[in-house]
Amino acid sequence: MIKGIGLDMIDLERVKQVVEKNPRFIERVLTEKEIKQFEKYEGNRKIEFLAGRFAAKEAYAKANGTGFGKHLSFTDVEILQVEDGRPHVTLPVKSGENVFVSITHTARSAAAQVIIEI
C-alpha cells in the first residue's frame, strides 16, 4: 500500500546563487556521506547533485506527510548512490517501508519523485 507520494522541482541557477552566497548551505542539506559523493564531482555537476538531493529530500518530506520543521530536517534524510548508480534513501527508512526515489536534471532544473510504500 502506498503511504505517500512526493514531488519537487528546483532551479539550478537558484541553488548556485545560494551556494555562492552561503557555502554552508551544502552542510545544511547534505549528510557527511552525501558530501563525500558531492566532492567527487566538478563544476556544474556539483550543483546538479546538490539540487537533485535537495529536491529528493523535499519530495521525501512531502511523501512522508511531515514536511521539514520540528520533526524532520534535511540532514535526517540521506540519499546515497548505490553501485548501479541509482539513488537510494538510506535514512530514515522505517521497518516495513520501501522508499523509491527518482532524480532527474535538465540544463536548468532538477526534479525528484519519492514514493513510500508500507
From Swiss-Prot:
It comes from the Bacteria. One of its GO terms (molecular function) is magnesium ion binding. Its cofactor is Mg(2+). GO terms for cellular component: cytoplasm. Pfam families: ACPS. It catalyses: apo-[ACP] + CoA = holo-[ACP] + adenosine 3',5'-bisphosphate + H(+). Its EC number is 2.7.8.7. The keyword Cytoplasm applies. GO terms for biological process: fatty acid biosynthetic process. InterPro entries: 4-PPantetheinyl_Trfase_dom, 4-PPantetheinyl_Trfase_dom_sf, ACPS, Ppantetheine-prot_Trfase_dom. Keywords: Cytoplasm, Fatty acid biosynthesis, Fatty acid metabolism, Lipid biosynthesis, Lipid metabolism, Magnesium, Metal-binding, Transferase. Transfers the 4'-phosphopantetheine moiety from coenzyme A to a Ser of acyl-carrier-protein. Belongs to the P-Pant transferase superfamily. AcpS family. This is Holo-[acyl-carrier-protein] synthase. The gene is acpS.
